[in-house]
Amino acid sequence: MRAKSILKQFLLPRDKNSSEVGKSDSIELFPNDSLHSLYANWHLPGSHMLPLYNPTNISPYEFHSRFNSDQSYKRSPRLSVTKLLTDRWCELSEYYTIYAGSPQFKVTNAITQGLERHSELEYELHQPIDISLLMETLSGSISDAISHFQATIKDVKDPDLLSELDGNPDAAKLAMEWSDHSINRLFSLITTSEAREVLVHGFLNLENSEFVSSIDELKNSQNGNIDIRKVLVSGIVDHFKIENLEDPTDLSLFREIRDYMDYYFDTTIGDKQVIDLTKFLQSVKQFVEEHKSAFSVKTTDVKTRSVNRLPSSISVLEAAKFQTFYYRKMFGLLSNEHQRTENNHFAYYSLLENARVRGIDVDEPLDIVTLVSILRKNYNLFYLDFVKLANGEPIGFEPFDSYNKGRENTGFALDSVFGIAEKCLLAGKPMQLDLIEKINSLEDFNYDEILSPDLIKNWKTAPTLRYLAARCAQFYELFSELLGDHTAVEYHNGRTSQAFHTSESKYTEDVIGEQTRKASTFWNGKRFPIYTRDLSKCNYCDFKPRCMVPNHQLQGDLYRKSLGAKINEFLHS
């Protein structure tokens, strides 16, 4: 104990005030807020250089989840795919950034160019539908309705109506993403051969450095919201493409699917075929089975550059490749690539867990604004499904149908939502609120076709995130036998919007396994961060003024790192 006390006198701050760098000092000592925050968070004397190891007992992932400038990461701890690419530039810089509180990065011209190019590519393939005015109008009308209810109707016999009017914004956002960037995009992939901006996710176990791959692991939750055995990792795939690598002109799979759709789905709304997803998903499985030996999915990421020149850093080029590998890995998990059993449905339970870790109830009915927005954007896919839910019919996905069959369903009063005027009138409080008439005036689209009497009634099964998870899972599972090992990184000129180079790679489980281990041991704090040997990178780093690497103070650093870590472990034991 005496040895520990002596060490603390020499190596730890004598009191909290002496360890923290004040705001006035930061102006003199540090040229930026990131350095100030890092010194304050690590309780370092302002005169010291930055250590190469973490002097606290909080792992990078735990710190990232508890102290983050983005509040959403504190509410719902998670990592993005890019955060797993720890050595794409300099791991030590990434390490410092995490412990500085993950300050928000500045939006540069290069970032803006990249976002614009990605949007251009997305909209070329997926026609955008602007629903902002629809959502604004619905939200305004519903806000008025809620105020009217609360102010004038004291005895509301169905209080659930208020939740159907005004829902959870996090649930609404997730519902819009799953409906459009999973279900709609995967429908595009299987019917037209390609899709852009597709959602994928997985759960990474930082203890064993592997992605969770079993339903039992998904259901095994740890107390608290920071569970290192099940870290949510999310990504958006720039481009999926199904192709016959031996004959790129072969479109037989898609012709057969199109012929099937034209024959069996002859009902249209507007200019779109209305699809019965229950029948579609069952039939397309057969087409995939017949063509699986010839076709495969290629995973591509798009990078933008201001000039027609590749990055000079090998680590940046390698990180771009590994990013596609992570996407391919997670897509494989969601599609049941290695567990091709009829009743596994890993994606379904993974999606439910995805919502749970975000603190979202998957059985809470979607609010009216979200429901109508989903229907407006992709009525060709959801109209008949919503009719099934309204009638209490099964959708053809056993886990979802069984869950609803064995459960008392409170339903969903869409007739009450759109009949608020009548409800208020019956309560002796007349009020005019014809929502359908109001939204019909917004654009050249007939909302009466999608908000028909088949839907404007009391639904027997409420529309929920659980329903969307079920349909998402079925679409992911379509690709279990179409997953290829080809990935690519396309480099586009942000100024000319032209692709100038494509790097092709071959995905292997061994390579992604090694990358996952490297990322996991970084985030769980089991290894030291690796600093860059390319000192030109230091010119772009906020931590350069106090980092030992560019300031040539690394002599004997390996000894100091190992000794420092041992001392730190001893002090905190």
Curated annotation (Swiss-Prot):
Cite the record's note on assembly.
Answer: Monomer.
Cofactor(s) needed, names only, are: Mg(2+); [4Fe-4S] cluster
Q: What does the entry give for GO biological process?
A: interstrand cross-link repair
Superkingdom of the organism of origin: Eukaryota
* EC nos: 3.1.-.-
**Compartment annotation:** Mitochondrion
User: According to its UniProt entry, what is the function of this protein?
Assistant: Single strand DNA specific 5' exonuclease involved in mitochondrial DNA replication and recombination. Releases dinucleotides as main products of catalysis. Has the capacity to slide across 5'double-stranded DNA or 5'RNA sequences and resumes cutting two nucleotides downstream of the double-stranded-to-single-stranded junction or RNA-to-DNA junction, respectively.
Which residues are listed for [4Fe-4S] cluster binding in this entry?
Answer: 90, 538, 541, 547
Family named by the database record: Belongs to the EXO5 family.
Primary localization: mitochondrion
A cellular component term (GO) from this record? nucleus
The name on file for this protein is: Exonuclease V, mitochondrial
Return the Pfam families for the record: Exo5
On cofactor binding, the record's note says: Binds 1 [4Fe-4S] cluster.
The UniProt keywords, alphabetically, are: 4Fe-4S, DNA-binding, Exonuclease, Hydrolase, Iron, Iron-sulfur, Magnesium, Metal-binding, Mitochondrion, Nuclease, Transit peptide
Check the record and name the InterPro entries matching this protein: EXOV (IPR019190)
Write out the GO MF terms: 4 iron, 4 sulfur cluster binding; DNA binding; metal ion binding; single-stranded DNA 5'-3' DNA exonuclease activity
